[in-house]
Curated annotation (Swiss-Prot):
This is Pentatricopeptide repeat-containing protein At5g61990, mitochondrial. InterPro entries: Pentatricopeptide_rpt, PPR_P_subfamily, TPR-like_helical_dom_sf. It comes from Arabidopsis thaliana. The keyword Repeat applies. One of its GO terms (cellular component) is mitochondrion. Residues 1-31 form a transit peptide. It comes from the Eukaryota. The keyword Lyase does not apply. Belongs to the PPR family. P subfamily. Keywords: Mitochondrion, Repeat, Transit peptide. Pfam families: PPR, PPR_1, PPR_2, PPR_3. PANTHER family: MITOCHONDRIAL GROUP I INTRON SPLICING FACTOR CCM1 (PTHR46128), PENTACOTRIPEPTIDE-REPEAT REGION OF PRORP DOMAIN-CONTAINING PROTEIN (PTHR46128:SF350). It is found in: Mitochondrion. PPR repeats lie at residues 96-130, 150-184, 185-219, 220-250, 257-275, 276-310, 311-345, 346-380, 381-415, 416-450, 451-485, 486-520, 521-555, 556-590, 591-625, 626-660, 661-695, 696-730, 731-761, 765-799, 804-838, 839-873, 874-908, 914-948. The lineage of its organism: Eukaryota, Viridiplantae, Streptophyta, Embryophyta, Tracheophyta.
Amino acid sequence: MMGSMLFRKRTLVTRANFLLFRSFSVNVEKLSDASAEIAGILKQENWRDTLVSSNLSIEINPEVVLSVLRSKRVDDPSKLLSFFNWVDSQKVTEQKLDSFSFLALDLCNFGSFEKALSVVERMIERNWPVAEVWSSIVRCSQEFVGKSDDGVLFGILFDGYIAKGYIEEAVFVFSSSMGLELVPRLSRCKVLLDALLRWNRLDLFWDVYKGMVERNVVFDVKTYHMLIIAHCRAGNVQLGKDVLFKTEKEFRTATLNVDGALKLKESMICKGLVPLKYTYDVLIDGLCKIKRLEDAKSLLVEMDSLGVSLDNHTYSLLIDGLLKGRNADAAKGLVHEMVSHGINIKPYMYDCCICVMSKEGVMEKAKALFDGMIASGLIPQAQAYASLIEGYCREKNVRQGYELLVEMKKRNIVISPYTYGTVVKGMCSSGDLDGAYNIVKEMIASGCRPNVVIYTTLIKTFLQNSRFGDAMRVLKEMKEQGIAPDIFCYNSLIIGLSKAKRMDEARSFLVEMVENGLKPNAFTYGAFISGYIEASEFASADKYVKEMRECGVLPNKVLCTGLINEYCKKGKVIEACSAYRSMVDQGILGDAKTYTVLMNGLFKNDKVDDAEEIFREMRGKGIAPDVFSYGVLINGFSKLGNMQKASSIFDEMVEEGLTPNVIIYNMLLGGFCRSGEIEKAKELLDEMSVKGLHPNAVTYCTIIDGYCKSGDLAEAFRLFDEMKLKGLVPDSFVYTTLVDGCCRLNDVERAITIFGTNKKGCASSTAPFNALINWVFKFGKTELKTEVLNRLMDGSFDRFGKPNDVTYNIMIDYLCKEGNLEAAKELFHQMQNANLMPTVITYTSLLNGYDKMGRRAEMFPVFDEAIAAGIEPDHIMYSVIINAFLKEGMTTKALVLVDQMFAKNAVDDGCKLSISTCRALLSGFAKVGEMEVAEKVMENMVRLQYIPDSATVIELINESCISSNQRVEADAVP
């Protein structure tokens, strides 16, 4: 008998190991298969646990890691970086150099430059020879397929060596890049030159300088300055002077920045060299372009003091700069100064001043200059009139604008369609649609044909005012004039009709515009998408989104933001990121809302690093975060418990001049409460009052919860009373929190009294007394349990909400654990009478109760009733009932349920067994002498990956054999 048992044990071990090998092993010779398997695991959220528990028969060696990185099977480089870090942290063997290169390239391709730099720095720290590192990056770059600029990683490598202080290696990278025809940035070259000067490596300095010249790198003042220092340090003073004069030549071609040019100009004056007029003109022009107008004006004074001639050109440069800087008064002063100097003033200077003044809205000054121009004998031309008319119309003074239009006619000045259009637009904006229409008829009568812009303005305004018939009449007249509607006209029609929900008419114009050879754009499709969304016809909206893409139309940022938001709402952050990257690749610049929506989606799906990277990218693109953007970050880090980070972002937000609102404070306050930093939460509450912000119900709910969990019920109830005094109605969460807090301190009686503190009650919810019941049945005395149960059943708590399935499940479970099955069964029937459906938890509690009391015969009808009621058993329920069948010797029925359980797992993985459950099942079959059945069950457990490794298999087999031996010994007893 014992020999047979030993043989069976060995057979089981052999078969189990074979099954494990077939399920988890990877052929070492097939590297790509291993790479594919690992890549598949990496696509899972819990890839680390899966990878560790997979027990791959091959070791994850450097060759496999390299294969995974170069295979491009994993789209998320951040996940590849996490995998690489995890493998590298094992410190078993050194990773291959090419692995670093491929990973850095992938990160660069995804725009994660900071992460790429960290990988490069780790590569440098391995102390590989720079030639090998360079060769690896070149080789991998040639093999890599991506959209990143080839020069990005080489620049990062250069930065890495500089940051580590490896100057010679940085020079090697600089020199080697010449072979790839890469032009280094001037900023990088200057950093390298500066380092070489500090280390007095003039030999390498001149090599780098020569390379810069050969690659036509444009020098700035600082570069020339370092060159002069190098010459002087080498004793070549004359060469240093030559560089200075060469810099003057560069200055004349305006290749230096303005500050550098100013410094050079000062050095020239100090050396007794008076800059040429051309030099001053370039400087004034440069200063005006960067809006340093006071500096530009001071140069005008300096020119005069040095005897440099001032002419019309110099003044015009400064006047133009002042006008572009919206400083029309100063420009007007220069005009008078020119008159005093006897410099001829050209009419266009007046026109420019009048134009800017009109745009600034200083119409009195503009009109005064206009009248002064006439007084000086100059006749204003069409531009001056057009500027004034536009200014008056912009200020809604359409009548004054129209009078100037009449004056133009009297002076026989040709009126352009643009000027007519300005008056038409002004009248439309002021609501005088009939007057605008009369101007159009007046145009036609005078022989000036209205253009499509003017007609579109009229049509658009008629549609906005729901005068659809007039809009169609104007459209018809436009066509009769031989003017074909353009894309803007059709878009105005489609947008106006879509907003009025006249979608069929809008669609007819879409068909017409396509027939006329016009291609719909994002505004066209956007009108349909917005119209259908507003009408809650989402399927139709999706149809137009798809049609837009199929037609190759780029969406605008509003549509892109909407798509990103929808993806994030559905938890599809990969698709959301893809939509964002597609938007960026297509040159569409998002706004703060775009980035906020994406960051919020990433945080909600635990992509914290990616959310931070998007925030940095947002700042890098010059898009200023708003309160909502900062709120997403503060809320995300607060929920993660990283209050140091959340507080830092809060401080940054304040430093940026943004004022936090109550919602922002609630986010921080909640984070501090969850982290147990209740005093900091109280400080925030006080700070809100100091800043004039009124805490709302959420504020009080949050901090009351914090004090309850910290055990300070006195402060919690004080805030509870304060909340009600301020007219804020506590919701069910507040009551639940207070109940839970009282019960934690074993003050159940006080918890019961809470329900009588608010005569108006709170939002209908069973949560407060579910919390109470849980504590009462867990720790309360029998009398208290009976009292609460009676009050619950007689409706005393009904104003707070009727008992739900959770209420009954709590009570039934505790009664079953106490062995009070009759009371539990009575509650079960009351639950059904209250039209509440028992759940799998309800039935499992009853089954456990009967099993504990040894009343297994009563378990089986309960289980049958659960199945008949449509309950889907979980692994706990299956385990309980199967063990009951085994204990009663009903092996066949137990095996039927085991097969059902295995089949269910194969379909939806919804019933995966734990090791303890596996142990109980195998032991149960072994104890009743069903070793063949136990063997079959074990094979299924291995196949479905319930058992993680061979060691566990052997352990379970040993236990089963022991149980079987005990059965044999029991049978042998006479």
